[in-house]
């Protein structure tokens, strides 16, 4: 909302949102923004990945043979800081795990895995652990029953923040410390 106001787009976005007959959202922050713009409370829906039992009912997830123990780093390129990358590399070394990067090339990764959405789930299923800073990385960890850490960041200036969406997800799933 703050950035829309900064760029003088809040009125335009608000008017466009009011033209919809219905709006649904996945998190409280998005819901608050929609309500501020439209005066209407949106419908809250689960992410589609949580509405289907992919791991037990989908025959498109391949069996991937793991030749080594690994943790998945699921993050877009450029979002893992050097300090975080160093910490992840040291953590993996202590646990005797390789770091497989999915979603983007990472400084600390032993291997970048370029794969289909169904293969992503196969890699998650076989991982020892997951470190992510994404909404879907957290969800994939939950549906594959993998231990995971979600890196949460505040929006500062023009930098990407995931705090609102991820904090809401983890609170709704009762997965906060």
Regions found by a protein language model. Give the residues of each.
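Active-site anion-handling motifs in enzyme catalytic cores
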Residues: 1-177
């Amino acid at each position: 909302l703050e950035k829309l106001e900064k760029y003088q787009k809040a009125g335009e976005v608000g008017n466009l949102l009011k033209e919809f007959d219905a709006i649904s959202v996945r998190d409280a922050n998005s819901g608050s923004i929609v309500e501020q713009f439209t005066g209407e409370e949106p419908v809250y829906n689960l992410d589609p990945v949580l509405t289907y039992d992919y791991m037990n009912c989908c025959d498109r997830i391949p069996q991937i043979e793991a030749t080594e123990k690994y943790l998945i780093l699921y993050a877009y390129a450029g979002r893992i800081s050097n300090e975080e990358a160093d910490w992840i590399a040291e953590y993996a070394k202590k646990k005797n795990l390789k770091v497989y990067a999915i979603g983007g090339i990472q400084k600390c990764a032993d291997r970048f895995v370029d794969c289909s959405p169904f293969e992503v789930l196969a890699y998650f299923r076989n991982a020892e652990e997951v470190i992510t800073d994404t909404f879907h990385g957290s969800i994939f960890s939950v549906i594959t029953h993998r231990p995971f850490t979600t890196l949460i960041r505040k929006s500062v200036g023009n930098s990407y923040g995931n705090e609102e969406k991820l904090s809401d997800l983890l609170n709704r799933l009762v997965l906060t410390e």
